[in-house]
């Protein structure tokens, strides 16, 4: 009974501190229109946002409009929110399209590969994704390789 009461008090206090639909994050711009909250395993795709952010505090608002609000008051419309996904260990044949430098989408899904510093162009090109563990791996594309630091799947927010 006491544990339940304490848990209820905790929930009430945190609800007051963070209004519904507002999620505090620390974000870094990883590519044009992409911001990562590495500590939360979240990747955010914005619409025409040019804020140069490195470990900047921001609020992800998941209300009707969907915005990423920076502490200086700058607001960016959010297109899609992605969360880290685990893939089965091993080799996967995939079809990829480069969205931005270091960001590749997998054909037929709402999944992105985050491969920073990878600039190989691709437009629905065949590739091999070699997952070394369930979270990271190597993308073999056009005879080159890129280190995949994360696989992210779109969520409704």
Annotate each language-model stretch with its function:
Residues 1-4:
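Positively charged n-region of N-terminal signal peptides that target proteins for export
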Residues 6-15:
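Bacterial N-terminal signal peptides
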Residues 9, 42-44, 103, 138, ...:
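Weak global preference for isoleucine
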Residues 20-62, 90-108, 112-113, 117-120:
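N-terminal secretory signal peptides
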Residues 18-26, 53-97, 123-157:
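Short, flexible, surface-exposed loop segments at domain boundaries
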């Amino acid at each position: 009974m006491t544990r339940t009461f304490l848990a209820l008090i905790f929930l009430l206090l945190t609800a007051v501190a963070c209004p519904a639909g507002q999620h505090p994050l620390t974000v870094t711009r990883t590519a044009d229109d992409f911001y990562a909250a590495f500590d939360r395993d979240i990747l955010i795709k914005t619409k025409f946002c040019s804020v140069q952010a490195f470990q900047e505090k921001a609020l992800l608002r998941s209300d009707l409009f969907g915005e990423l609000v920076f502490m200086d008051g700058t607001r960016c419309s959010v297109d899609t929110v992605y969360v880290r996904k685990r893939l089965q260990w091993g080799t996967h044949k995939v079809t990829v399209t480069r969205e931005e430098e270091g960001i590749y989408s997998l054909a037929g899904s709402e999944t992105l590969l985050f491969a920073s510093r990878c600039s190989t162009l691709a437009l629905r090109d065949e590739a091999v994704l070699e997952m070394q563990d369930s979270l990271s791996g190597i993308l073999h594309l056009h005879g080159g390789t890129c280190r995949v630091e994360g696989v992210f799947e779109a969520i409704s927010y």
